Amino acid sequence: MKVLVINSGSSSIKYQLIEMDGEKVLCKGIAERIGIEGSRLVHRVNDEKYVIERELPDHEEALKLILNTLVDEKLGVIKDLKEIDAVGHRVVHGGERFKESVLVDEEVLKAIEEVSPLAPLHNPANLMGIKAAMKLLPGVPNVVVFDTAFHQTIPQKAYLYAIPYEYYEKHRIRRYGFHGTSHRYVSKRAAEILGKKLEELKIITCHIGNGASVAAVKYGKCVDTSMGFTPLEGLVMGTRSGDLDPAIPFFIMEKEGISPQEMYDILNKKSGVYGLSKGFSSDMRDIEEAALKGDEWCKLILDIYHYRIAKYIGAYAAAMNGVDAIVFTAGVGENSPITREDVCSYLEFLGVKLDKQKNEETIRGKEGIISTLDSRVKVLVVPTNEELMIARDTKEIVEKIGR
């Protein structure tokens, strides 16, 4: 079975075509700057990269170019679009309704649209990708995999906010959590690496990229996560503030004379590492490099960043009454030995002992255990693979309906 995985953003479509027998990626790429000047398709087959400059006014045109490229004589990896058995889509927000991945029908499309106010930047773009695929590949089943679904097992005590309950009843304001597909994949893979059943383990997964979140996974089910009603809560991120006193935005708005929308943009796009570094960079690699060269301010930023992660790990060890494994994933988590070492230095009370050499060596797509043999809690690096998780869900659902 061949599954086309699509991640449709506001001005881009990322894609992978995966042969599910052996789970081999046949090709992958991104159509970028959709609806903007300078749009193009970057297509990769094995290690070869091809760039097609083309005007892409909308998502449908972008997907059309992707599909044409898949069957192209020179760049293609299949002879006919009929070889695509199913399409799997990433959808950021499924609200409370979707607790697992589902087959797309009119009712599902309507439900995704209904929860769009909860993810105004993402869900409408995700929908454009789904509708384009349904139009251009008629008769091919489409499956949606929600970022929020994995966190729907979180209990009320962890998802309700201490604000008037009517706001939950009226507007469904609660903790939803994000990066769910990543947390699900790496917790599952960590159990495989440890040679244990997921249902027997208490795992804390740390998805540390430009966006970042921590999840407490108890016996295979998520019981808490650091992102909340929106992806703004929790850790210090590339451009997002993470946790802060809710009175601060009101104070700034009053003092600076700025609107709610401007404040929202500041917290989402100009805060976090970018804000702390006074606009120097939102990329942790730049901060690390400057800190290693002796920049005291960047050293402090690293301290703030790592401290927040360690605090959440400590909290989730308490929430689960113990922890067996801590997993690092995503851009920073997979490639920054400094981050992993510094975070783990706070966790010695849990019995965490890091193997310095293994920690240094486990970067650039490598996976494995980076704690010592006698470490009471195992520490792992697992490169995330959300696309594969989406493809697996898609295959499972399509096989169930017997297509």
Swiss-Prot record:
Catalyzes the formation of acetyl phosphate from acetate and ATP. Can also catalyze the reverse reaction. CDD domains: ASKHA_NBD_AcK_PK. ATP binds at residues 14, 207-211, 283-285, 331-335. The keyword Nucleotide-binding applies. It comes from Thermotoga petrophila (strain ATCC BAA-488 / DSM 13995 / JCM 10881 / RKU-1). This is Acetate kinase. It is an enzyme of class 2 (transferase). GO terms for molecular function: acetate kinase activity; ATP binding; magnesium ion binding. Keywords: ATP-binding, Cytoplasm, Kinase, Magnesium, Metal-binding, Nucleotide-binding, Transferase. Belongs to the acetokinase family. The record marks 179, 240 as: Transition state stabilizer. Its cofactor is Mg(2+); Mn(2+). It catalyses: acetate + ATP = acetyl phosphate + ADP. Mg(2+). Can also accept Mn(2+).
